[in-house]
């Protein structure tokens, strides 16, 4: 028996999108939560929120039944370059973290390692509903490391602020 898979259909650039029948968290002044509600997006704007919305011809429809529709979240403190070492040292003290991440492992990171960590972290954030991130990129040894971090972010969907930091000028010196 062979299993056949199909790629999901994605909206075309500029195509209007409507989320149908979701639980909508509005984050407006009333902090409304609306059940079984549609959200119409045209371009980068939310054009309408309501039940049974009439939409333009050719609108891409997403069935949001059982799901939550809300604006993207903001993460103001993420060390994206460290994603490549996720879970490593999870039981360390803060002192061990500084010594091993910075003085041992962090200093062996190449620009391509920083790129991989930032790219993976960007994808991970988007998968969790985070669309804006401040990257506390304090493990950068050279300009090339900084450029790799920036390249990973600019080639990823989402919004990012790169908070550049140099590993050689840590608080322990």
What annotation goes with each model-predicted range?
Residues 108-173:
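Active-site loop-helix segments enriched in His/Asp/Glu that coordinate
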């Amino acid at each position: 028996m062979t299993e056949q898979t199909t790629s999901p259909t994605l909206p075309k650039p500029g195509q209007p999108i409507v989320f149908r029948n979701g639980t909508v968290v509005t984050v407006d002044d009333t902090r409304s939560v609306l059940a079984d509600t549609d959200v119409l997006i045209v371009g980068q704007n939310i054009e309408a929120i309501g039940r049974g919305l009439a939409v333009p011809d050719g609108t891409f429809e997403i069935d949001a039944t059982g799901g939550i529709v809300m604006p993207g979240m903001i993460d103001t403190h993420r060390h994206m370059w460290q994603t490549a070492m996720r879970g490593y040292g999870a039981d360390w003290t803060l002192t061990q973290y500084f010594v091993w991440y910075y003085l041992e492992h962090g200093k062996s990171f190449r620009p391509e390692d920083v790129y991989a960590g930032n790219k993976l972290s960007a994808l991970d954030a988007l998968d969790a509903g985070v669309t804006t991130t401040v990257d506390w990129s304090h493990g950068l040894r050279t300009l090339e490391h900084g450029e790799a971090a920036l390249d990973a972010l600019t080639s990823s969907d989402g919004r990012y602020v790169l908070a550049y930091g140099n590993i050689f000028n840590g608080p322990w010196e």
